[in-house]
Regions:
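Domain-edge interaction signal
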Residues: 1-108
Length: 108
């Protein structure tokens, strides 16, 4: 599993609730552009879009995480959202410390 995928799981875990697609996209954008780690060497690229930044790769990988049973599709406040499918396993713990701290700062 890539560090950026682990980071998505970690942010959903930190939220402790279903996270809308828009929220997760904005958190990932902030992580990439406003933190010292910048999300890591191969984090998501973003394009300007209707509601702010958008990443095709982020949505593709989130769909992969749903297919592999890490996330599940749901609704939050009437909007499409992702929620944790099960407890995030130990592989998320292998995420670099700087990235983990930056992700926690963005979600809070």
């Amino acid at each position: 599993m890539l560090n950026r995928q682990k980071c998505l799981l970690y942010m959903v875990e930190l939220a402790g609730r279903p996270v809308t697609h828009l929220e997760l996209t904005k958190w990932a954008f902030l992580l990439a552009h406003e933190t010292p780690s910048h999300g890591g060497a191969s984090f998501y690229d973003f394009l300007p879009y209707k509601y702010g930044p958008f990443s095709f790769a982020l949505f593709h990988e989130a769909d992969d995480l749903v297919r592999n049973g890490y996330l599940r599709d749901t609704k939050a406040d009437g909007r499409e959202a992702w929620a944790r499918a099960a407890e995030v396993d130990a592989r998320v713990g292998n995420m670099p410390g700087g990235l983990r701290a930056d992700a926690a700062r963005v979600v809070e």
